[in-house]
Amino acid sequence: MGAVLRSLLACSFCVLLRAAPLLLYANRRDLRLVDATNGKENATIVVGGLEDAAAVDFVFSHGLIYWSDVSEEAIKRTEFNKTESVQNVVVSGLLSPDGLACDWLGEKLYWTDSETNRIEVSNLDGSLRKVLFWQELDQPRAIALDPSSGFMYWTDWGEVPKIERAGMDGSSRFIIINSEIYWPNGLTLDYEEQKLYWADAKLNFIHKSNLDGTNRQAVVKGSLPHPFALTLFEDILYWTDWSTHSILACNKYTGEGLREIHSDIFSPMDIHAFSQQRQPNATNPCGIDNGGCSHLCLMSPVKPFYQCACPTGVKLLENGKTCKDGATELLLLARRTDLRRISLDTPDFTDIVLQLEDIRHAIAIDYDPVEGYIYWTDDEVRAIRRSFIDGSGSQFVVTAQIAHPDGIAVDWVARNLYWTDTGTDRIEVTRLNGTMRKILISEDLEEPRAIVLDPMVGYMYWTDWGEIPKIERAALDGSDRVVLVNTSLGWPNGLALDYDEGKIYWGDAKTDKIEVMNTDGTGRRVLVEDKIPHIFGFTLLGDYVYWTDWQRRSIERVHKRSAEREVIIDQLPDLMGLKATNVHRVIGSNPCAEENGGCSHLCLYRPQGLRCACPIGFELISDMKTCIVPEAFLLFSRRADIRRISLETNNNNVAIPLTGVKEASALDFDVTDNRIYWTDISLKTISRAFMNGSALEHVVEFGLDYPEGMAVDWLGKNLYWADTGTNRIEVSKLDGQHRQVLVWKDLDSPRALALDPAEGFMYWTEWGGKPKIDRAAMDGSERTTLVPNVGRANGLTIDYAKRRLYWTDLDTNLIESSNMLGLNREVIADDLPHPFGLTQYQDYIYWTDWSRRSIERANKTSGQNRTIIQGHLDYVMDILVFHSSRQSGWNECASSNGHCSHLCLAVPVGGFVCGCPAHYSLNADNRTCSAPTTFLLFSQKSAINRMVIDEQQSPDIILPIHSLRNVRAIDYDPLDKQLYWIDSRQNMIRKAQEDGSQGFTVVVSSVPSQNLEIQPYDLSIDIYSRYIYWTCEATNVINVTRLDGRSVGVVLKGEQDRPRAVVVNPEKGYMYFTNLQERSPKIERAALDGTEREVLFFSGLSKPIALALDSRLGKLFWADSDLRRIESSDLSGANRIVLEDSNILQPVGLTVFENWLYWIDKQQQMIEKIDMTGREGRTKVQARIAQLSDIHAVKELNLQEYRQHPCAQDNGGCSHICLVKGDGTTRCSCPMHLVLLQDELSCGEPPTCSPQQFTCFTGEIDCIPVAWRCDGFTECEDHSDELNCPVCSESQFQCASGQCIDGALRCNGDANCQDKSDEKNCEVLCLIDQFRCANGQCIGKHKKCDHNVDCSDKSDELDCYPTEEPAPQATNTVGSVIGVIVTIFVSGTVYFICQRMLCPRMKGDGETMTNDYVVHGPASVPLGYVPHPSSLSGSLPGMSRGKSMISSLSIMGGSSGPPYDRAHVTGASSSSSSSTKGTYFPAILNPPPSPATERSHYTMEFGYSSNSPSTHRSYSYRPYSYRHFAPPTTPCSTDVCDSDYAPSRRMTSVATAKGYTSDLNYDSEPVPPPPTPRSQYLSAEENYESCPPSPYTERSYSHHLYPPPPSPCTDSS
């Protein structure tokens, strides 16, 4: 490229001789040079591979070419004589740099930005950037410079189009053209003639004037389609035209000689005459020593013809030459994906983007004036970060255990960092480098947000926008907490301190006020309460309070005394927190400033003085300054929390920061993993977390009642627990997986539990009728009673060194001990008021006493040396010592889990055995396990249980399936091993694996497209076709749905039907269902497609509520809840007998399992069974099971038999329903809304015949006229048009063909029957004044021979003599017309005969129709049936599967209209993208003049982009914007939507603010955070459906990510 440019540069020196320049122009994808004298030749590409080059200019003397790229939001340059030398000049803070101009004398770069509405200047390398103009600009575009005079010129095509002039230093601004101007695009200067030229793309002219705007003249007008950019060389004007895609030229004086220079340009943009002549030399006042300026020296039109200037935001000193060393006061701004700084020293308030990467969701921001770091929180990255004020030195400060950090505050004195977390509901502190972290407050916080510090006094203040909004204060160590304000608050988002006046200010986004009070909570008053719809970020500096507003997308400030307001920045979306600060000034001090107050870790200042504090896991020793890691400490649970106490320092107890603890009971730990485990008898869970409170999770959530005892197997990594309510001892892995019941027989209220994994034993206490202490191997075997004569023993603990057991006795108030066999029993301590928990460490035992509310210690052998460790503790439930010595030893399970696939359980003999999850069986290898294949499932209201009939197994367990609300019915797919159930609360059908994984909604609760709400009642699975048959209580139909959730359709529906219980027999192709019709309940059978319907029983029934089927024995069973009995019959309905009718109260479910019939009795809370062979009678299976709802037996699937079923492979080839016929072959069928096509495999839409047509049942002829129905001729191939023809009524005449006509039409002279039989055998006598036609018809005599045919047989015009002159001979035209008429008549007659008689019989086999249909089953139109035309096409039962897609037989059986609607039979589907419904194209004021480019102006694909350098905006060059459109959406704000806004995916109308559309469409990115009330990350995990205390926006951590709601809450649809 360099060689080409050098040659072109050399050629340019020939310009003076040739009087024609090289033209440099931007072509969007490249920059090109073309010879103006030979423009027809190809242009030379100067720079290629560009995104969207718009403006271009050059500095000829330096060999530099500059251009702006609006897609990359950058200004770049290249050098003539270097290859691939593209350099970035300006890459930040640009949005749409439309205009560009080079000052070749002062060596400066000027540009316009039509998005930011600024004109800026910088050095040629992009340094020392300064905003010259930022006010009264509205779409500035072209810019031209006259350095010799110090003036600059630019066009503005905004609402008030104009051309302005100003000094190049920003002075002497003046409008020179503001009339007869609309879209001023191109602009150029004639330096020799001192003229200004411009092009207007709307008014289609090129005008010129003097440089001051006077003496305006037209150069070219009327013949310019769309001029864009303009340049001049000598006497010739050159310009680009968007419409013609060319470069044109004319004489600059007269406009004559208009010609095309260069054509076929992809997208001609800016243009310049590339010549030294266009950049004449002149005196440069800045040429010597930069004019004495420290930074920028700008040309000026007034003496001394230059002006010193400073970069944006920096003040010029009084000497007029030197700039300050950066800004003094800054406003730091956090946006969603970038950070910005705004200087408060200068009036332009230009926002400068910090060059930082990977900002995902910045929220809060603060500043440390000592080291110059900015600190901010990122909600998506879940981290706290920092960088220097220029964006360099970026670091992550805190990354662990961060959920939603909404507030941040720097203690610049003690060098600490504080933050609030509304996810963990904590206030924490750490050093500024992220070390030495400590939780200060974790209780009674709902939604903490803003936080500010007063290090001089020692207080911190924060807001909480929870259910009871408040502003609180505490010392910097978290002590002395007090509520300052808790009334008349909504969403207190922002908080700021006035250190000088002792005031605290806050902004409330719900009450829309800014208020102030004294720091002690007194003197509250309102400062601002007008036009602040959604305040968020908040700060104070000097006399001003600053805030961000989400809805107004603005930053404003108000004077704290006068309340005068000023807008700092406007229309900037995604605004979050902000901080106003003095960059270098540090105020105040406290004792922590000197050597960290002498503290080894944290120095926290309080009003009473400093306090040294330790991070989590450390403890303060007696000097109260030094923190150490303790060797051992006590852990204890106290119902609402879990705490720790050092054994070395006897310091105060410290709560472990755990959320959601309701009633902690048993407690243990895993020392190698540094985790604690605890049971919660209120939540009925077992949970775990790290010692610092992080990573809290529930490991066991199902099937617990009162888990009072729990212990960790630290060698096998297993968890054991004893449940007093279920009377079981269970085990699982530490994460809750592979759960198994070890002991369940003869357990009576098991309580305390202790493990000895090294020896393979477990020990427990029982509190039942005969309290005792038992022992068993850790697999539950070898059970024995060690201590039989004991009271309610608790706190069971083991001294592993001395091999002794210790326990407290709640009945005798003793602490006792024995050896590991229960012998050598001793009393260690007596005279104890109420001992409860107990543990042992080294030479001491530690116990809790409920009466003394204390933790005490004594010698473990003598009970002497009693000491109170801690007092004032209520109801300490459990206690233990956290130390490695308490978890020592080894067994084989400690190595690779003993090579067991699931559980490794230590035993005393043999070392270990492999164990399996409940109901699994150990394989022959004694290592691996197999899942059960035969079992029972039964459901309760909010649980599904599995039961096996095995004496060696615990009978039932609860399956770990989440979110069960109201289980009504269950079924199981043995092939995929998935469980299906109906949730009657959510009205849906769901499925999941037995372990709760792979949850999926199969049938949703509504069908929006059909406006249907459903209520599934019962379900049954066809495992061969992979279908679910289910009844619906709302629509009273039987539906079929594929197991993957795709609908098949309705197979059974009737006007009086109320199908409820259903069971399928796919082996025979039938289904059985109860039909609870009013006054006549029935049990019916039908084929799986709903045909062959048959009532089996209609008598002796009251409310048959449950069905079961035994295909092996060929038996059907049902339970009648009203008659309270269970009956059976053959599958055909024969041999009906009553199986059981005694002591049955409320049977709700039946199933067959082997030779037994099982049922559940909801009222008796019982599962029972009866032997179907009659040999063993009735047996109770299990009792005391509340809220039973259904039961289902799962039998082992024989894969060989399964594969032999004809429907098992690809559904038998059927597209929809596969049925087995009696001979073992298959028959395909369809749901009711479809019919079977000719291939007898596929289902399709039935023919959409009009209401005036009859639908043939099958065959290639679909529709015939209704009049042909029952006319005696068979037009349909299957003769269905002549089947079941009605008998005529008494008032009708029946034609010979069977057709019925009105009796009055008989013998009226007109043949009304198709066979004319109504006019046969008629005896007619005409009156005297009448003429009798040959067919017997009577007409008036005056109508005889009147040249009008009145008799239907035309006999009235026969035998007539002429009475008039003969008509003239017909012309050829008349003859032609007659010929055409005759031809049409003959053709019609032939067509009629063919259609009626011949064609239907002659159609060949090879012909095809659109759809071919085959219907199985007889036509069954009753005699006497007279079809309505609107129902003829779809109501014939012989076509019971016939219905259009939009017919009344919807998938859920709803009724919405006639079976066939011709209006809907069009080529566009309901989802057609061509539909324009709802599309709104707003009126455009001053619309864009550009031609239709690649981008639709209505889709607005371009848009606002964050200015982060890491962001790439891919919109194309946007020449003109739409004006007067609504601003971009913002998170749902206040006022309009405080109560009932719901998030919507709808986008506002196309009328969005220019450039902001991309903010509405960032589907792949999260929407701006709330941090505002009631966002989706509410720490209470509540689900608010209305517009919350805050924009219901961003916290979409599950899922899906929606754009923020419009603001205010409008519906733009």
Swiss-Prot record:
SUPFAM superfamilies, per database record: EGF/Laminin (SSF57196), LDL receptor-like module (SSF57424), YWTD domain (SSF63825)
PROSITE patterns noted in UniProt: EGF_2, LDLRA_1, LDLRA_2, LDLRB
Phenotype when changing residue 1531 to A: Abolishes phosphorylation of PPPSP motif B. Reduced Wnt/beta-catenin signaling
Secretion signal span: 1-19
Record keywords, A-Z: Cell membrane, Developmental protein, Disease variant, Disulfide bond, EGF-like domain, Endocytosis, Endoplasmic reticulum, Glycoprotein, Isopeptide bond, Lipoprotein, Membrane, Palmitate, Phosphoprotein, Receptor, Repeat, Signal, Transmembrane, Transmembrane helix, Ubl conjugation, Wnt signaling pathway
UniProt-annotated glycosylation sites, renumbered to this chain: 42, 81, 281, 433, 486, 692, 859, 865, 926, 1039
One BP annotation, GO: Wnt signaling pathway
LDL-receptor class B repeats: 63-106, 107-149, 150-193, 194-236, 237-276, 372-414, 415-457, 458-501, 502-542, 543-584, 674-716, 717-759, 760-802, 803-842, 843-885, 977-1025, 1026-1068, 1069-1113, 1114-1156, 1157-1198
Modified residues (Phosphothreonine): 1479, 1493
Result after altering residue 1530 to A: Abolishes phosphorylation of PPPSP motif B. Reduced Wnt/beta-catenin signaling
Start and end residues of each LDL-receptor class A domain: 1248-1286, 1287-1323, 1325-1361
Residue span(s) of domain EGF-like: 282-324, 588-628, 889-930, 1203-1244
Domain note: The YWTD-EGF-like domains 1 and 2 are required for the interaction with Wnt-frizzled complex. The YWTD-EGF-like domains 3 and 4 are required for the interaction with DKK1.
Descriptive protein name: Low-density lipoprotein receptor-related protein 6
Species this chain originates from: Homo sapiens (Human)
Gene name tied to this protein: LRP6
